[in-house]
């Protein structure tokens, strides 16, 4: 093998650099129209610097020496794989060239640092000691990069629209990659038979529809960045050799990711399964039946509060729905006649025991609606705590009389019957009668005046006292009432007339 003669190396290098710059400017303008990410500017500058360094290194390859350079593959991310090249002579600027080569001589863009070890398949290519082969490979690689960069502006985004998400953690091991795409789209530039991009427009519309659906369901950005990578599912082909557009074999086999937009919607439900909300059912409420002590007929039952569930990794996405009512389970059957109250614990204070004595006169805590005082025996423990709106709280204190009243005025009037006091005197001339109650005095005054203020609404008769009018009204009601035997006869007549129209029975008159 021999080194081919290059006519005008400076002119060829200038032409290559100008082509690269023009393609980069055109791609930037295309990316600004597509509103892609601005992270690609640094990648473009690295690509230009790498090509310039490779061109200058190819011209300096006439000097023979041992140089450790980084291989021209994205597989080497930290200088793990090195290539030994023999040169003729050494130059004084070897350290600077070695530093520039170790930092810049890699195929753009540089592979990310956060990669999975399982996806690496580094194979160190062994290059011969011939100077011609080394220079030819470098120049041909630079030409391939220049053509790929210029063709990136023409092709644009072939498959899918870029998604503004975090960078893809998958390892891209192709030699030449679309730098016009977003970092999340891991597309190799070289077309392989497994990459199904013929109907990319349909996949793009489907993906946009999926993203609108996911925005409606309020998925977080972390879900989009980890589960919705645009190259899902990826088919890995290990150990394959990539072919350039001129039929040359690249000496770095790696794992090639081929994209399939058709399988995206089949893979989406499997990726979004870890965040499915789990509804925890409400625990049932148990009623503990406490044994009844004594002669009480009330069975206390307390509701146990439900146990607090510790919130772990399960976090529902959607809003919580209305909780289902908690079922209440009661243990044994309650005997007939007993009363069971389901109350919160501590709502009712324990009843205080009552003393076994006779209620004194004037006591305000007597049994409700009692016509007379009630004697509590020693067998009864307490008085039932029942609240009534009206109570006979006023009891006559005279010995042997246990009458109770609702009002104090009624009790005072009753006490006058025991004492014989008559504070109300008749003011009529020649009348010295006295009365214990004011209503009795008013009634007596009507006997002097002859006033009859109570009138019957039926027959307009007047009465001096209201009780006389009540008795008279009952008389009117009894005269209008039909006797029982007449009602029965009338009922029989109606039944007979309904059965036979020519019935000889004649209806009796309504009143005799």
Swiss-Prot record:
Keywords: Activator, Apoptosis, Diabetes mellitus, Disease variant, DNA-binding, Metal-binding, Nucleus, Phosphoprotein, Repeat, Repressor, Transcription, Transcription regulation, Zinc, Zinc-finger. Ubiquitous. Higher expression in erythroid cells. Induction: By TGFB1. Pfam families: zf-C2H2. GO terms for cellular component: chromatin; cytosol; focal adhesion; nuclear body; nucleoplasm; nucleus. The modification Phosphoserine is found at residue 124. Its main location: nucleus. Residues 109-128 are annotated as: Disordered. Residues 118-128 have a biased composition (Polar residues). It is linked to Maturity-onset diabetes of the young 7: A form of diabetes that is characterized by an autosomal dominant mode of inheritance, onset in childhood or early adulthood (usually before 25 years of age), a primary defect in insulin secretion and frequent insulin-independence at the beginning of the disease. Transcription factor. Activates the epsilon- and gamma-globin gene promoters and, to a much lower degree, the beta-globin gene and represses promoters containing SP1-like binding inhibiting cell growth. Represses transcription of SMAD7 which enhances TGF-beta signaling. Induces apoptosis. Interacts with SIN3A. This is Krueppel-like factor 11. It comes from Homo sapiens (Human). The gene is KLF11.
């Amino acid at each position: 093998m021999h080194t081919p003669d290059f006519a005008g190396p400076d002119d060829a290098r200038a032409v290559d650099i100008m082509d690269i710059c023009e393609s980069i400017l055109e791609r930037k303008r295309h990316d600004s129209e597509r509103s892609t990410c601005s992270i690609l500017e640094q990648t473009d500058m690295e690509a230009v610097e790498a090509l310039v360094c490779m061109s200058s290194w190819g011209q300096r390859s006439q000097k023979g020496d041992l140089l450790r350079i980084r291989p021209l593959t994205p597989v080497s991310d930290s200088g793990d794989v090195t290539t030994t090249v023999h040169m003729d002579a050494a130059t004084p600027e070897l350290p600077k060239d070695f530093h520039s080569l170790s930092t810049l001589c890699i195929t753009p863009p540089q592979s990310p640092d956060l990669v999975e070890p399982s996806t690496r398949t580094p194979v160190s290519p062994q290059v011969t000691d011939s100077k011609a082969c080394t220079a030819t490979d470098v120049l041909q690689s630079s030409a391939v990069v220049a053509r790929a960069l210029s063709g990136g502006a023409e092709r644009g985004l072939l498959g899918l629209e870029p998604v503004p998400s975090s960078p893809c953690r998958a390892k891209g091991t192709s030699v030449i990659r679309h730098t016009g795409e977003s970092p999340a789209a891991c597309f190799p530039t070289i077309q392989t038979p497994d990459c199904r991009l013929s109907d990319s427009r349909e996949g793009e519309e489907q993906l946009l529809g999926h993203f609108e659906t996911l925005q409606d369901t309020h998925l977080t950005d972390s879900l989009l960045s980890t589960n919705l990578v645009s190259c899902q599912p990826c088919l890995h082909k290990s150990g394959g050799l990539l072919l350039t557009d001129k039929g040359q074999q690249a000496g770095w086999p790696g794992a090639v990711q081929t994209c399939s937009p058709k399988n995206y919607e089949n893979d989406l439900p499997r990726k979004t399964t870890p965040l499915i909300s789990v509804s925890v059912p409400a625990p049932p409420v148990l009623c503990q039946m406490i044994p009844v002590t004594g002669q009480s007929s009330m069975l206390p039952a307390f509701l146990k509060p439900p146990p607090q569930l510790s919130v772990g990794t399960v976090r529902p996405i959607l809003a919580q729905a209305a909780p289902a009512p908690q079922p209440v389970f009661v243990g044994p059957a309650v005997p007939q006649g007993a009363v069971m109250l389901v109350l919160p614990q501590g709502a009712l204070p324990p009843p205080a025991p009552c003393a076994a004595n006779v209620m004194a006169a004037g006591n305000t805590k007597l049994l409700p609606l009692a016509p007379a005082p009630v004697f509590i025996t020693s067998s009864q423990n307490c008085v039932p705590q029942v609240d009534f709106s009206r109570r006979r709280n006023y009891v006559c204190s005279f010995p042997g009389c246990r009458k109770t009243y609702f009002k104090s005025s009624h009790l005072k009037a009753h006490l006058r019957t025991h004492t014989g006091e008559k504070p109300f005197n008749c003011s009529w001339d020649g009348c010295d009668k006295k009365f214990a109650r004011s209503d009795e005095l008013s009634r007596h005054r009507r006997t002097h005046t002859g006033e009859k203020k109570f009138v019957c609404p039926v027959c307009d008769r007047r009465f001096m006292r209201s009780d006389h009018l009540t008795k008279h009204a009952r008389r009117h009601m009894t005269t209008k009432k039909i006797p029982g035997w007449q009602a029965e006869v009338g009922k029989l007549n109606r039944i007979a007339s309904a059965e036979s129209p020519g019935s000889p029975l004649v209806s009796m008159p309504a009143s005799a």
